[in-house]
Each structure stands twice: as structure tokens, then as C-alpha cells.
Amino acid sequence: MLRVGRVYESSFHHNAVFVGMDEKENPKYAAIRGIGTSFIGEANGSDKNYSFSIFTEKPQDTVHLFESAIDLLSYATLQKLEGKEWRREHLLSLAGVYQPAKEIEKSKVPAALVRTLKMHPEVKTIVLHLDNDRIGRLATKAISAVLPKQYQVKDVPPKQGKDYNDLLCIKLNLAITKREKSAKKSMSGHENMRDRR
């Protein structure tokens, strides 16, 4: 991921940047996360249809869905630590918390998942790895309810902690980073980022 520019450290504020690409490997989305801070943002003009993902080169019938790029990469790391080949299945982040409608049946399938299912018609199973909090559980319920019945949906939240990054930290005996609730910010340029810090 680092070698191909999908994940990098921004030079100005030293934030982690997770890049979502289109089919021609053009950047279309960038999630920005503070390193050692609770900062969360995304680049102006980001298209959530192209959120951070890792797709297999060969057709695969399963897609794993996460709230964030960090959870996706934490899951991949856990798979690797367990001796499993994490590159054998499609991995997709939602670029943040999914907000279902008040009436769950009126919710929509997340844009990134709609695009992925169109790109990969061979997918039959969707594994939801959303957070172990009220919002994550509600999102799981809503997505499960609105997905077409042709898909098998599995709910596999982390066994410990709030999310897969917490689970990875627990497995590695690392401190879990405290996250403050803060408004998500959209960034365009260095000056804009400086003003928001």
C-alpha cells in the first residue's frame, strides 16, 4: 500500500492519508486521520463511491465491509498474524460511519458497496465488520435489511473492543488510542488544514 501511494503520511501535518482509487488507479477519495490525535477529515472533492479498498485481482465471491480504512488494515493485519491470506477476499471501507434512515427499511445501501457490487458481480457474500457500538450495530441492522436478498450477509463484529483496530491493539498488547467525538472535517489545501488544527 505504501509503495503504490494508497497510504501515505502528509508532509504538512503528518496525518495518515488513505487513498481510494478508480478502476484506472486514479485517486478519487482520500480519508485523512491524525497520527496521535483524534483528527478525522477527508480531502475536498472526495467521492465516497471510491472509498479506500483492497480488491483481489481474481474474481472472488466475498466482500468484507468496514467503517474505516484503519479497521480494514487492522483486520488484514490480524489475518496475517493468524497465518491467513488476507489478499484472497475483497476488503472495502465505508469512509466513515454509515447513517441509516430513521425507518430502517428506507435506508440505502452505502454508495461504495453499490459500486463494488456492480464492479464485482461474482460477489455472493457480504461480511459486515462494523463497530461494536450502538451506531455500528444499527448500521449493521440497516445494511442487512436493505441489501437485495440475493446476497448472504454475515455479521462479524470484533470479538473484543469497539472496532478492529481496538482488537488488533488488544492482541498486540498495545494501548488503545482514545478517540474524542469531533466533527468530520473536509480539507482542500495546506492553509485550510493549518486553520483547522
What are the functions of these language-model segments?
Residues M1-N49:
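Basic, glycine-enriched DNA-binding surface that flanks or lies within the catalytic cores of DNA
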Residues F18-G20, V63-F66:
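Short pre-functional
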Residues N49-P59:
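A short acidic-Thr-Gly-centered motif at the start of a beta-strand
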Residues P59-V63, T125-I126:
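Short active-site oxyanion
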Residues E67-S68, N132:
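Helix N-cap/beta->alpha junction signal
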Residues D71:
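Conserved Rossmann-like nucleotide-cofactor binding loop
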Residues Q79-R197:
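TOPRIM fold recognition
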